């Protein structure tokens, strides 16, 4: 029996990802100066304009236009011909103080928002992530890297990759297709571009066992991609939530991450859920694990908790859930302290996925021995 799984990744110059990076870069700046800042920011980017909106309570001052221009420059929008330029874009702000009713709920160490959060892990890839999203992120990250270091100087910042993979009996078999859309200068030959992207990036980022004669690879199948970035599409925070997470394999709780401080449980709770799922798979108690937690605004305890292992479990669900609840902190305030989330770590999460990066605290297997004492 076989089925198809897919995942999408975008480069850091994609309009929606520009917005996510700006939101998290600003969050980092506020947290750096005031770790207890309450931040909920939304960003819109379009031709020649960045709009920053949201709610904020903090003791710190951040020069928002300066941060915005610095991030846009770092991404690579530094030429007027791109239609969006770090030096000339307008930066408009409309930021209010956080609602006192929301502040009251958080001050009692309750959840800063009502949220369904999910975390997923699978033994497929070395980082215990699904292969489709892992491959997609590897390709887009390499495209951006080669642009920035000047190896492919004709590349522009925007881009997108879609990966479709065939699974047989629940296990990854081969990559069925990859479609890449790569933003480029007008004077590069489309055939030369396609050859370089396919041979120097895509084929080198797919594990050999997944690359077969059945694999279809297409680059810019519609032709030229010269007009890109915010001049071509308006970008908004929170529009790449499946790409931010696990692709189409792991469920999504529906909430976005970027621009939110850790009192927002749709962010911090999702990080803990991933950590739990990763521990379950790393410990050998299941081959796949989906953790779902429900939080309600102002309440200090989760209102729902579930672990799904898709028939791959080596131990009963009841025993597993009981051990997890004993080992991991599930209260919002405890999650923040446990994962040390009042530090400026968020911009790095805003591109190429929030999960699977081994340097992030929720990817560490720090509770594995405690779980083994209860389960082995």
UniProtKB/Swiss-Prot annotation:
Binding locations of ATP: 14, 158-160, 224-225, 233, 239-240, 256, 260
Keywords in alphabetical order: ATP-binding, Cytoplasm, Magnesium, Metal-binding, Nucleotide-binding, One-carbon metabolism, Potassium, Transferase
Predominant location category: cytoplasm
Pathway: Amino-acid biosynthesis; S-adenosyl-L-methionine biosynthesis; S-adenosyl-L-methionine from L-methionine: step 1/1
Compartments, as annotated in UniProt: Cytoplasm
Binding site for L-methionine: 55, 98, 233, 264
GO biological process, one term: one-carbon metabolic process
Cited InterPro entries: S-AdoMet_synt_C, S-AdoMet_synt_central, S-AdoMet_synt_N, S-AdoMet_synthetase, S-AdoMet_synthetase_sfam
Needed cofactors: Mg(2+); K(+)
GO CC annotation: cytosol
Cofactor note: Binds 2 divalent ions per subunit.
EC number(s) per entry: 2.5.1.6
Residues that hold Mg(2+) according to the record: 16
Region annotation (Flexible loop) ranges: 98-108
Residues the entry annotates as binding K(+): 42
Enzyme class name: transferase
Family: Belongs to the AdoMet synthase family.
Protein name, entry field: S-adenosylmethionine synthase
Species this chain originates from: Aquifex aeolicus (strain VF5)
